[in-house]
């Protein structure tokens, strides 16, 4: 599994955006499904656009998520486990983001 922390990719740092980890992709897909459920019917093409994946990759990840019992596919929706994953992932990501700000912000040239 890759890193859970995103690197700032603004033009100021000039770094390319790192590839997303599988957990980030799962979170993006599950989050897109959650948003679509609020609006009504969940359409795969809208999940594809919101999760920024090619359709063949989206199909593969949907199969993985169904196998892990995080989604239902007919109709497309979240299971309790999928909702729990999103809550836990968001909590962990928030914690890691806070740590990055606390320990890494402004450290360039500062006291060690």
PLM regions and their residue ranges:
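A short, conserved structural fragment
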Residues: 66-77
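Short acidic, hydrophobic short linear motifs in intrinsically disordered regions
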Residues: 38-50
């Amino acid at each position: 599994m890759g890193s859970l922390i995103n690197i700032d990719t603004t033009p100021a740092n000039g770094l390319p955006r790192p590839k997303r980890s599988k957990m980030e992709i799962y979170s993006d897909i599950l989050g897109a499904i959650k948003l679509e459920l609020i609006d009504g019917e969940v359409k795969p093409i809208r999940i594809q656009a919101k999760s920024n994946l090619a359709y063949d990759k989206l199909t593969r990840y949907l199969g993985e998520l169904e196998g892990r019992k995080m989604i239902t596919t007919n109709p497309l929706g979240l299971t309790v486990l999928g909702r729990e994953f999103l809550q836990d992932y968001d909590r962990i990501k928030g914690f890691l983001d806070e740590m990055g700000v606390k320990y890494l912000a402004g450290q360039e040239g500062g006291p060690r």
